[in-house]
A protein has these predicted regions:
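Soluble periplasmic/extracytoplasmic beta-strand elements of cell-envelope proteins
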Residues: 93-97, 201-203, 216-220
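AMP-binding (ANL) adenylation modules
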Residues: 207-210
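Transmembrane beta-strand segments of Gram-negative outer membrane beta-barrel proteins
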Residues: 222-227
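Interaction-mediating elements
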Residues: 1-193, 212-214
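Gly/Pro-rich turn-and-neighbor structural signature
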Residues: 78, 203-204
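Extracytoplasmic/periplasmic membrane-proximal domains and adjacent transmembrane bundles
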Residues: 195-200
């Protein structure tokens, strides 16, 4: 089968606009951490073969664009296709569809809601997190807390094993920003390059504030050498 007609139009104008984004002009000074140009190239096109692998990659591509632009709760399972091959001409008409966000209410029922963008509220870096700790080692004991350019830095038992400015510069997730998976990837990469740290783990907690969805971010790290 070949695709005769292909439609990708979503009822939410903001999501529809993001799904049709064109690649921004790349600065020669831009980070080479991840080439994002491919994410802006539509994979499903009229006249091409009907290929299930390509259809799945297109769902992944749009999911990536949305998660780069605030849609923390979005995943590829919200996207699907409606295919019509009733023409008996080895062609198919294809529409991409999007399911609404399904929120589980306190009473256990499920309510369909629009997909919402999330903003970063607070960012906290914990420098002595022990993911394998038991007993006393399982608890985090703060010995010092600092605020550096909006990032909370909490030192533990090992004290200031790394300068606050280094941790801040390695943190691409900042309060007030739209959630972006790209910022998470850059933060993981920056922290992985710090030899004084290991076992970096980034977690989020949802917070609803004045009808705005926000996320508290926790960057959990362990010192490479325990004093």
């Amino acid at each position: 089968y070949r695709i005769r007609n292909y439609t990708m139009k979503f009822p939410d104008p903001k999501i529809d606009s993001l799904a049709h984004l064109k690649a921004p002009r790349r600065s020669p000074l831009a980070s080479a951490f991840r080439s994002s140009q491919e994410e802006y190239n539509q994979l499903v096109k009229e006249g091409t073969l009907f290929d299930r692998d390509i259809l799945d990659k297109e769902r992944e591509r749009i999911t990536t664009l949305l998660r780069w632009n605030g849609y923390y709760g979005f995943n590829r399972d919200y996207l699907g296709y409606i295919a019509d091959s009733s023409f008996n001409q080895n062609v198919v008409d294809l529409d991409m569809s999007m399911k609404p966000y399904r929120k589980v209410l306190p009473n256990g029922s499920v309510e369909d809601q629009p997909h919402r963008q999330y903003y970063i509220k607070d960012v906290t870096v914990l420098t002595d997190y022990n993911p394998m700790g038991v007993g006393e080692d399982a608890s985090f004991m703060a010995t010092d807390t600092m605020l550096s350019a909006g990032v909370n830095i909490v030192y533990g038992r090992n004290g200031k094993s790394i300068r606050p400015s280094v941790l801040r510069r390695s943190t691409y997730i900042r309060p007030g920003q739209l959630f972006s998976e790209k910022n998470i990837e850059q933060t993981y990469s920056a922290f992985a390059s710090l030899r004084a740290l290991r076992n970096v783990n980034i977690r989020f907690t949802e917070v609803e504030e004045r009808d705005t969805m926000k996320l508290d971010c926790y960057i959990l790290t362990s010192p490479a050498k325990i004093n």
